[in-house]
């Protein structure tokens, strides 16, 4: 399965996933549609990058003037500092520079900066990109990269999957605008969910379902079904459950869901689990009903509902309030009642703090839910 690639990346610390240009373009364009000046006069930092290969650097450098950027900074991580060792391949862009050092290129990160017309053609674009070696290896946690973070206004990148939690903490410390790529299951992380609940982070626009294709190094093991090699020998894999996480506003975030009433759902829902029913399933350990599909949320229900985490793809903060994430310690904090001992005998996998309902005399656990409630003003 394609999502095996994500698990492999976490295990092997092989985080060299190169985001495709169209995926970057679609997301950034959505921000521009909502606010054409969102990047104007701003310094953009692209950390955790490989600028010689990266489509992030290519996109922002090619569109420097269109976006109205003040400065573009992109940093790379030293090859020998990576947990997953791959043969180092310097590009012509690197080797043709007089300050190129083959040994230093393996042990030091690099910084690429674009802020002025170097070529003299009266344009600022990718041809004006300049690079130098960093003092260190380019680790985003280093003082050197933190200083660049603090200089920036907006941070955009596809951070290492294995370090996503730590990267989010690093971002929050900066109080900067950001757009980063991660797996949808990161919604459940303790470093992430409180930000979503408090409307300090939300889902991006352009990726809502299915999988996405990423470029990978030549040495990446193609062990899953979702991969291909193009006519030039470049390798690609498909990864499921990918999302943009951002705090840059966009229009879709403010579009209320169009929903049917409870009665209409029972009569017209396309889901057999809903159509023909007389009521939604009620949880045993929390006063809420279970909604297994986002489009089955009843528009006229005033109480608390448990919805799939993918609801966040269509979440409108003016329409709904997020109550919490009822799993484990989060659930206990919300007041979910512990499981009776006799139920744990029926299902050894039960964990206090998780939502459940009864089905055929046995406890059933719905897959990852978020508790929400409709706002009265909508």
Regions found by a protein language model. Give the residues of each.
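Class I S-adenosyl-L-methionine-dependent methyltransferase catalytic core
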Residues: 1-156, 160-378
């Amino acid at each position: 399965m394609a999502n095996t690639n994500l698990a492999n990346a976490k295990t092997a610390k092989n985080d060299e996933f190169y985001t495709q240009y169209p995926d970057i373009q679609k997301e950034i364009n959505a921000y521009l549609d909502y606010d054409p000046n969102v990047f104007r006069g701003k310094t953009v930092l692209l950390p955790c990058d490989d600028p010689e290969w990266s489509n992030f650097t290519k996109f922002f450098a090619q569109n420097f003037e269109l976006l109205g950027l003040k400065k573009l900074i992109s940093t790379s991580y030293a090859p020998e500092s990576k947990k997953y060792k791959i043969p180092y391949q310097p590009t012509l862009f690197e080797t043709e520079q007089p300050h190129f050092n083959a040994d230093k290129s393996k042990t030091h990160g690099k910084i690429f900066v674009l802020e002025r017309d170097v070529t003299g053609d009266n344009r600022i674009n990718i041809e004006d990109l300049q690079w130098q070696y960093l003092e260190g290896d380019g680790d985003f946690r280093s003082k050197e990269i933190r200083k660049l973070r603090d200089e920036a206004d907006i941070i955009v990148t596809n951070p290492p999957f294995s370090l996503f939690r730590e990267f989010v903490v690093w971002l929050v410390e900066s109080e900067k605008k950001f757009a980063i790529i991660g797996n949808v299951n990161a919604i459940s992380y303790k470093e992430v969910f409180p930000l979503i609940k408090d409307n300090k982070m939300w889902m991006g626009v352009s990726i809502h379902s299915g999988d996405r294709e990423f470029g990978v190094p030549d040495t990446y093991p193609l062990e899953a079904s979702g991969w291909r090699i193009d006519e030039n020998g470049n390798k690609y894999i498909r990864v499921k459950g990918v999302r943009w996480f951002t705090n840059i506003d966009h229009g879709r975030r403010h579009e209320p869901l169009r929903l049917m009433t409870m009665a209409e759902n029972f009569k017209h829902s396309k889901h057999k689990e809903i159509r023909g029913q007389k009521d939604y399933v009620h949880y045993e350990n929390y006063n809420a009903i279970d909604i297994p599909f986002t489009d089955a949320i009843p528009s006229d229900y005033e109480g608390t509902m448990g919805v799939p985490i993918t609801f966040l793809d269509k979440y409108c903060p003016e329409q709904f309030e997020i109550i919490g994430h009822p799993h484990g310690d989060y659930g206990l904090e919300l007041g979910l009642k512990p499981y009776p001992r006799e139920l744990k005998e029926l299902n050894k996998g039960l964990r206090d703090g998780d939502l459940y309902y009864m089905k055929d005399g046995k406890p059933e656990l719905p897959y990852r839910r978020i508790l929400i409630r409709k706002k009265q003003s909508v």
